[in-house]
Curated annotation (Swiss-Prot):
Ranges of Polar residues composition bias in the record: 50-62
Keyword check for Coiled coil: no
Gene that encodes the chain: mustn1
GO cellular component assignments: nucleus
Name assigned to this protein: Musculoskeletal embryonic nuclear protein 1
Single Gene Ontology BP annotation: chondrocyte differentiation
Residue ranges annotated as motif Nuclear localization signal: 8-16
């Protein structure tokens, strides 16, 4: 006959130590430069005094998207 399936056992988190919190706060306090492309663009726009491009803006140039533009030529066949 079939046996009842065991329910997954939930594990409890270990108790948080004050030393762990201090170490995490110290890591956050370090001045690590942000390497995000979005952050770079925002910083450049802020320094030049212009507004950063937005996907919600009505003034789109078309360069804001990461998708490839379709080529002007006719589609090529995969068979030849």
């Amino acid at each position: 006959m079939s046996q009842p399936q065991d329910a997954p056992v939930k594990k409890k988190r270990p108790p948080m130590k004050e030393e762990d919190l201090k170490g995490a706060k110290n890591k956050l306090a370090h001045q690590v430069p942000i390497k995000s492309k979005t952050y770079q663009v925002m910083k450049e726009c802020e320094q030049s005094g212009t507004m950063a491009p937005s996907v919600f803006s009505q003034n789109k140039t078309g360069g804001e998207t990461a998708f490839d533009k379709p080529k002007a030529g006719p589609a090529k066949s995969v068979f030849g």
